[in-house]
Amino acid sequence: LENTNHNYTIVQGELGTKLFLQTLMNQTSVCFDTETTGIDALNAELVGMSFSWSKGEAYYVPFSENRDEAQALVEKFKPFFESETIEKIGQNIKYDLKILSNYGVSIKGKLFDTMIAHYLINPDMRHNMDVLSETYLKYTPKSIEELIGKKGKNQKSMRDVALEDIKEYAAEDADVTYQLKQHFGPILDKAETKKLFDEIEIPLVPVLAAMELEGINLDVPFLKEMSVEMAKESAALEQKIYETAGEKFNLASPKQLGDILFDKLKIGGTKQKKTKTGQYATGEEILSYLANDHPIVKDILDWRQMVKLQSTYIDALPNQVDKKTGRVHTDYMQTVAATGRLSSNNPNLQNIPIRTERGRLIRKAFIARDENYTLVSADYSQIELRIIAALSGEENMIKAFQNNEDIHKSTAAKVFNVPLEEVTKEQRSHAKTVNFGIIYGVSAFGLSNQTSLSRKESAELIDAYYQTYPKLKSYMSAQVDFARENGYVQTVLGRRRYLKDINSANMMVKSGAERNAVNAPIQGSAADIIKIAMINIHKKLTSENWKSKMLLQVHDELVFDVHHSELESIKPMIKHEMETAIAMDVPLEVELGEGKNWLEAH
């Protein structure tokens, strides 16, 4: 900053603010940024706001520590924020939306988020402002650490920083973000992702902000009970493992565990994988592969799962309840998963394990607002399979979906060449594994690991599968060819996934990119579809003044807090909006459930 021409001004006093507002209201496109007392938007207070609408020029408006005075100043800026004609630019603008919402301001008009723009341009890169500025503007902004120090107990608050220093830092943020917008706008147009940006990603920002501010109710006493139970169970299992091993050892130490399993108990023969440091590898993948070789392996996997559940969810969730609201507020991130799917943090809802009984129980802790509300879960049924059927134009699969057949049973009947009514449970289960595995490039080796089939039987099953659905095979090859030629693949709505390794000389790396060439358009299309549904449902809930709220989005599922008086009218609305989010040759199907808690509803 010191070596760059810039003109940053502090806006103060009644007259200064009035004159500034007159100029501000005459602009058509303005970048703004809030400076606050912390990163938790629910509890942070405004320290200041910066604005920029021209390169090298920016303004900083400081806010009083007195809440009433700060609120009075915010009110003066309401006409700007609520103007439909002025475009507002920001970097991670969802945070600013949440801060302003706490001051009773709802932002209207067109939005532009540089972080999201860059995510669509280059999903695999980092998207924070400093990186973007250095990469695209060849300019290094002041770091927050220069102002308040490193994270930790000695870190200062923004309130403690001298006005002149905070002005330079905050105004620079707005200036840099404004310049990034000028840079990214044309690139978005060229990459043909502007429609996705304008119609899905940007309209989704206020939807996610509303969901995050709403939060969800948590049954803390239930989790405390579960914690005591889980501690007992894992301690008992630990003792059992020591008895089987014939000695006590540190279960959490991969080295000690490797020595016990492979030197002492000689599990899995002599060819055991070692890490760079020379100790045995004991990761989940390796142990899962050996699970049938010795009972101790299954117990160790079980014990690990219990310990992880307890530390990551059962004991952590109660600490994530906000003191002010008494609810848990997850943070949704739009710019992390390269496929276009949302991810979440604090808590990470996407990773709550649902394949095991214990993992599913954690959902029981998420409960309705009070006795007047019920949780409703709406889940897309087999959305990825429906998408690949539509994209590949595979008639056999499309017909099965159109006739509302059980797709796994229907696949089994065709693959094993038996009448539909004679398909066994086991045949259906094998067909299901292939159906879901095929888009992730499942191999005969992988299939035999997941089922009771031998490798030879698995290879035969995969061959029969491709003969049953020949267009799937040709679609998958065409996707890989397209990626080889263009360096990217795209979703139904034009979301791109760049695959720089698609022509790599390294076979492992190349086959990973080939798998992505097939599954990125499918996962990404599923992500686009649920995002459209969320935008449309949110629009209805707010414009029609429903009491019910949308709370969570996890994978292909949406969770709502529904007022009893609205239960029967909201369910068909949700189902309709989700099933008609996008028109395809294959019908989308949504399953609805309801209950006092998320487990019951799902």
Regions of interest found by a model, annotated:
Residues S101-L111, M125-D130, E394-I398:
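A short alpha->loop->secondary-structure connector
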Residues L1-E65, A72, E82, Q91-I93, ...:
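Conserved "right-hand" nucleotidyltransferase catalytic core of DNA-directed polymerases
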Residues K156-R159, P206, L213, D322-T330, ...:
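Conserved catalytic core of nucleic-acid polymerases
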Residues A70-A72, S253, S565-P572:
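Short, conserved charged micro-motifs
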Residues E2, S29, T36-A70, S377, ...:
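Metal-dependent catalytic core segments for phosphate chemistry
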Residues S106-N122, N404-H408:
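Conserved beta-strand -> loop -> alpha-helix junction used to position metal-binding or nucleic-acid-contacting
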Residues T468-P470, H576-M584:
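A common structural junction motif
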Residues N250-A252, K549-V554:
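Short beta-strand
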